[in-house]
Amino acid sequence: MKLTFTVTYLTPAGKETKTTVEIGIADFAAWERKSKRKVQDLQAGMGIDDMTFLCWHRITKNKIDARDYETWLESVQQIEAEGVEAAHPTAPAPSDDN
């Protein structure tokens, strides 16, 4: 599964910036370690802390912002979900076994 979010936040200098991030496997694994929950739990609903942590993790991995999570979170102005891509968006290719 891949999620895409657009996050508007303030830089350390106070400038508003908008960043679009694609959340992938490494981000979900980090979220599982932090939250002590499984990614399947997100199917029941995703909270603000879930979304912002996933975005922060990707932003820091992409070296866009180096602040710790709590400091960065205080600067977030808005978060928008852009899309969800399934883990297997197409049907499997035919094989000799089918």
Tell me what each language-model feature is.
Residues 22-25:
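Flexible glycine-rich active-site/ligand-binding loops centered on an Asp-His dyad
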Residues 1-18, 29-48, 53-56, 60-98:
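Charged interaction scaffolds used for protein-protein
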